[in-house]
Curated annotation (Swiss-Prot):
Belongs to the eukaryotic ribosomal protein P1/P2 family. This is Large ribosomal subunit protein P1. It comes from the Eukaryota. The keyword Amino-acid biosynthesis does not apply. GO terms for cellular component: ribonucleoprotein complex; ribosome. Keywords: Ribonucleoprotein, Ribosomal protein.
Length: 14
């Protein structure tokens, strides 16, 4: 529960 959230947030915030 860290890489998934960071990846999703980074991709969405893009």
């Amino acid at each position: 529960l860290g890489a998934e959230i960071s990846s999703l947030t980074l991709e969405e915030a893009r």
